[in-house]
Structure formats: structure tokens, C-alpha cells
Amino acid sequence: MNDTVLKPNLIIRHYKNLHNYASLFQEMRSYTDQRDEHSPDQLWILQHHPVLTQGQAGKPEHILIPSDLPVVQSDRGGQVTWHGPGQMVIYFMFDLNRLKWNVRTLVSFAEQLMIDLIKKYNIDAYAKADAPGVYVAERKIGSLGFKIRRGRSYHGLALNIDCDLSGFQTINPCGYAGLEMVRICDLVENYPRFDQLAQDVTAYFKEKSDFNDVQVILQ
């Protein structure tokens, strides 16, 4: 049998407007629960309205300063983080069994995606074995957290572009006290905006051999 036939199709949804975290959280869960072995994998690229999200390992004491930011309990891995405008969020709804990936493969893929994306703009980033995410000179530029149900993933990564870092100052980001965050705009003068990076992500997946057909939907 031709190997191409066995590869899944991928739908990339590029959301233009800001989206509510809680609503998309429920949509991700619903898609994961209802999909079957024939369902295409999906990748959602978007920005959220400002929000704090607690992962499964999150602790209340990691929220340092009361604020008017909503706090949403999530079922992803990891601890507390901030999402908001100027931060690119990518959600991976992948059938890991079909891709023949394990959790480590998914995490490494997401980290390498961020590293490769910003390397194009002369930013040298790296991952750490003991602290998931992507770093530049010990400052964190990209975070990630996943949930796996019946071999299928949802949630994903967040890459800081030109977001307001004050949201991170109300928390211990990812549970690490004093962890300094950094943005692409801090490192590159003529930095790529959200739409450009979303196009870069689409090109990245079209070049990958893991998927048969890549369809892009603008929303």
C-alpha cells in the first residue's frame, strides 16, 4: 500500500480575531471526544483575550497578585500561565497513534517548531530537558502544555511576539519563581507580526512529510 495514503490530512485554522479561552477549550475537548480514526488532524493558530490558565499541576500560590484577569482551570499539563494579544497560541489536535508519535515526540516537535520559526529571524533559541518550553539566553519565549486522551492530543504552545508582559508579573510563570519572559519584539527590531508568523507555521507544516494534505481555513 502506498505510504501517502496512510498519512493523515491536516486542517490549519488561522483565526484573525481574539478568542475567548474557555470557549475554545470546550471546542477542543469536544472535537477530541467526537473524532474517530478517519477524522483529520487539526492545528488552530490564534490569539486569546487576556486570561490566566491553571494547568493540572498548577497551585493557587503561583498566582502572586490579585488582578481583574479571569482565571480558568484547564486540563492541560503544566502550571499557571498567561495568554493574551500579541502572543501566538497553537493548538494541536493530533491523533498520536496514527502519526506513530508518543508524548515526547509531540513535545519535541512543538519545541522545535518554535525554535525553527524564530531562527528565520536570527533568534537563537533552545529547549531544556528539565523545563519544557523554549528559551533565549535563559529567558523564556515559548511555553507549552498538552492533554492526551485516548492517544489524541489537544492544547499546545504559546509564543511571545509583542504581548504585554505585565500579565506574567502577576504569576510565577509555569510555576518557576522569578522566571523572566522575553518576546520576539525584544530581540528583533523589524520583528514579524502574528499574521506573518501564522503564514510561517503554515509553510512549515506544508514542508513536513508527516501529513498527506494540508488545508488552510481563515476564520
Curated annotation (Swiss-Prot):
The name under which this protein is listed is: Octanoyltransferase
Binding residues for substrate: 76-83, 143-145, 156-158
PROSITE patterns found in the cross-reference section: BPL_LPL_CATALYTIC, LIPB
Q: What is its EC number?
A: 2.3.1.181
Q: What are the recorded GO MF terms, alphabetically? A: lipoyl(octanoyl) transferase activity
Q: Which HAMAP family match?
A: LipB
Q: Pathway, per UniProt?
A: Protein modification; protein lipoylation via endogenous pathway; protein N(6)-(lipoyl)lysine from octanoyl-[acyl-carrier-protein]: step 1/2
Reaction it catalyzes: octanoyl-[ACP] + L-lysyl-[protein] = N(6)-octanoyl-L-lysyl-[protein] + holo-[ACP] + H(+)
Q: Where found, per UniProt?
A: Cytoplasm
SUPFAM superfamilies, A to Z: Class II aaRS and biotin synthetases
